[in-house]
Amino acid sequence: MPRLTIRDVQKMKDDGERITMLTAYDAVSARIAEAAHVPLLLVGDTLGMVVQGHDSTIPVKLEHIIYHAEIVTRVTEKPFVVGDMPFMTATTNIEKTLENAARLMQEAGVSCVKLEGGAFIAPTIKALTQAGIPVMAHIGLTPQSVQQFGGFRVQGREFDSALQLIRDAD
């Protein structure tokens, strides 16, 4: 069975289908998710907290994501696998960001990369997609910004922050 593609995910969205995504960091969880017909798997930087025991995602390196994502892609056939871009790997330096995203695609075999941030990362997303790298954006509660927020805080409760989330999603 072929791996799902970005076009498959877009069709699911266009058809109004509810899309399930689970996080997987290892062979066991990836196989269980695939057996349960979960169409999307995220190899997220939360592995820093869940697997490595850190109190945030900040210490996670690109090499950690590549290692875990390669395991997930190796043991699954169908799920669309999303690889997280850890803290400071998707920066204002577009060339470095392209290099990091390309490593995730080439070395780990992910279907797409995930970046945290809002409208300010639009130029980065444009550069990545023009280079042929599919991107999934993560807005709202962004763990890589936990230090800036002073901890994990719900976003969008106040009018101004809710409006900013809408702008970011656009």
Residue ranges and their predicted role:
Residues P2-D170:
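Alpha/beta enzyme core
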